[in-house]
């Protein structure tokens, strides 16, 4: 009898020990938990790189004509052309500070104050900023030297570009026409990209070409195309305008072939060279011999 009680006591004690062990194990699982996942507040380098890759995706909405863009500054709007995936061709006078009476100065505006709007309809579908402005030391009032190339903050991957004709000069009698985002007072619709009526080149100077064209405010800096091609032979600079966009008036376009160094400098700056490491630009046309020494 005493032996059976002893056995039952031993079994009860062992059951208590097993139960205590189970409780200790269970409580141990609650106390000793694995490390919790932590989320970084700031994006990692991999996340930032992924954002850059998204920005550099091809523009599936773009059409070839979207290479012609709208240039928007603090006091003006002009037209420009994408000539490389990070370079915009436009007019010099669009990018200088104005005096108290609207007169043009020689001081180029801050590139950060300029934005490029993409798309040719009434509303832009994208925009990009400007990192640097390359322009000769003349042309701020229009005419000779009135060209400029903008270096963009990022590449516009997948967008079409248009080619400046730098080697073959324009010819008298050659047909040409401008394109721009201008709008005249009697224009029937809002601002959008439009091809303008042009005609034959009537006269040439070393740095300009003269023709009759329909031009509106805002067309400045727009490309002047040789007829039947996408080659740019000039940019819109000066024109005798009235309120009607169908009126063709005497117009002066800045030649591109006279300022090939502007394009070369812009390419070097876009590739990472500091602007102060380049020789200064001059207003002597590239296609003319230097003046004779006295």
Segment roles from a protein language model:
Residues 91-95, 217, 234-242:
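Short beta->alpha transition motifs characteristic of CBS
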Residues 31-81:
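N-terminal activation segment of mature serine protease catalytic domains
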Residues 128, 144-212, 241, 245-266:
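Chymotrypsin/trypsin-fold serine protease catalytic domain
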Residues 26-28:
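C-terminal motif of bacterial Sec signal peptides marking the signal peptidase cleavage site
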Residues 31-32, 39-41, 83, 111-112, ...:
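C-terminal subregion of chymotrypsin/trypsin-like serine protease catalytic domains
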Residues 63-109:
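Catalytic histidine site
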Residues 71, 80, 86, 90, ...:
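Terminal peptide-recognition signature
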Residues 43-63, 101-157:
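Conserved catalytic-core segment of clan PA serine endopeptidases
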